[in-house]
Design a protein with these regions (language model features):
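Canonical Radical SAM [4Fe-4S] cluster-binding loop centered on the CxxxCxxC motif
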Residues: 164-197
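Short helix-loop-beta connector
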Residues: 161-163, 214-218
């Protein structure tokens, strides 16, 4: 288990997601000043990574080694949070010897940046450079992100924005977890007995939606 001590709860989600990407096989727990005292007492002796935040930067301690970040020497046009994520990525990359294919991007939609830059009229080369330099994304994944973003734009041109709707179907079981993903999911091996009941419930809800949205156009299905 990896226990991370964070001096402020503001960035708990981002820190947890990125640390988990580097230590995919380990349970990752983040403790902050808002963590319950009894849990702090239990986990603090197990801290393996400590992050101290300040207005002008941050300090990360891994074991006995300190890593310092002076935010004033970095162009933080995209905000403190992204600067912190770059610093944390560089630190963990150095400590583990790993480079993640999606860099410091976490979440469920790593193509969002490419999509936004295409809307701004940026060239493929500009987007590629930004994703490599600002988010440490590999060239292969950055090019994939640009390609997918272009396909998304073409598809969204056909959306019925006023008379249509989108359908989201949650599947909480995954055989594996993607490195960039922070979605809540459960290993299918441990919950296999619940799959049939869950699918039955999904079908029931789909029947309800089909009956009650007959006057609208189903544009997209997210699974």
């Amino acid at each position: 288990m990896k226990v991370v001590k964070l001096s402020h709860p503001n960035y708990e989600y981002d820190v947890h997601s990125l640390v988990k990407a580097f230590y995919a096989e380990d349970q990752v727990t983040v403790i902050t000043p808002e963590t319950k005292p009894e849990k702090l007492a239990e986990l603090e002796p197990q801290v393996s990574l400590e992050i101290e935040l300040a207005e002008t930067g941050a300090k990360i301690r891994v074991g006995e080694e300190d890593f310092l970040w002076d935010a004033e020497t970095e162009n933080l046009a995209d905000g403190y949070k992204n600067g912190l994520k770059r610093f944390l990525y560089r630190t963990l990359s150095k400590v583990t010897g790993q480079k993640l294919p999606w860099g410091n991007l976490t979440g469920i939609r790593p193509t969002k940046i490419a999509y936004g830059m295409l809307d701004e009229g940026r060239s493929d080369a500009e987007i590629l450079d930004f994703m490599e330099q600002s988010h440490y994304v590999s060239e292969e994944k950055a090019l994939l992100g640009i390609d997918i973003a272009k396909r998304e734009r073409d598809l969204l041109k056909e959306i019925h924005y006023e008379g249509g709707y989108s359908l989201y179907i949650g599947i909480p079981f995954c055989p594996t977890t993607c490195l960039y993903c922070s979605f809540t999911s459960y290993p299918i091996a441990a919950f296999r007995r619940q799959v049939d009941a869950y699918v039955d419930a999904v079908i029931k809800e789909m029947d309800y939606v089909a009956e009650n949205f007959q006057d609208k156009v189903l544009d997209t299905v997210y699974i």
